[in-house]
Amino acid sequence: MPEKSVDADKYNIKVAERCFQILDLAVAKNSAISIQDVCQSLDVNPNMAFRLLNSIANAGYLDKDPLSGAFSLSMKCLRLSTTALQSNGLRKLTMPYLELLWHSFPKANINMGIRNGDDILIIDRIDGNSLPRTYFTPGKKIPFHCTGLGKVLTCTLGEAVIIAMAERCGLKSYTPETIISIDALLRELERTKRERVGRDRNEFIVDDNCSAVPIFNQNGEIVAGISVSALTQNMSADEIEACIPKLKETADRISGVLGYQSI
């Protein structure tokens, strides 16, 4: 997390900050939160927690369960996140290219993601013809260590940064194929950096495969990633691997529009 400047602290309003911390808590928990949750997370007394929660609910950003008294994120928050995604300039720029990519692989899901601190966020997705849909929906956070997008978006960060991220986020095991060793992860990210391809072969979701490639800006920095993914019942791992040349071609075109010039 970036350090606050002196000016930021000078103009900071503590109550407003706590309200946003409560919303962050609700997002992180991904379920209803209680007064006790807020007390523990923010180190405030129950009376303050009650007042903060009810103030946010009165503003329409939390819904209160009349039976349990717990609070959950409201549809107003969903509208905010949807508007944020729709206003993302990168998302608007890449959509035509993602649609063309989907027409080449209609059985696959086409995804675009970005890194925001320790978080890997899906900001766009075109679903394949086949159902069911998987976890990758716009606005969702996915782990960095076992997804194709996570790997391409972190492969240039450096060993010390990756180790620190792993300590903060953990290397949770989702399937028998998930990388849970920091040494194995560092080797995998080095391969990702060298080949400019992030691979997820049943690491995050059982029987789901993904290939991802980076998008660069004019400074040669990775600013996003795009991927092709599908359940094995729709496309085999070999078919997902065969998508890589077209995937790279699409990413190169997007990077070129952003001003990137490969050496």
Positions of PLM-derived features:
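Short, structured helix-loop boundary elements
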Residues: 12-16, 70, 74, 87, ...
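Short regulatory alpha-helical segment in sensory/regulatory domains of signaling proteins that mediates
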Residues: 98-106
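Short hydrophobic alpha-helix segments
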Residues: 124-126, 226
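Short, hydrophobic-rich beta-strand element in sensory/regulatory alpha-beta domains
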Residues: 107-114, 120-121
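Extended hydrophobic
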Residues: 178-250
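Short, solvent-exposed recognition segments
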Residues: 132-204
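N-terminal helix-turn-helix
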Residues: 2-87, 92, 252, 256-260
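Short, acidic, Ser/Thr-enriched surface-loop or helix-capping motifs
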Residues: 66, 115, 216-218
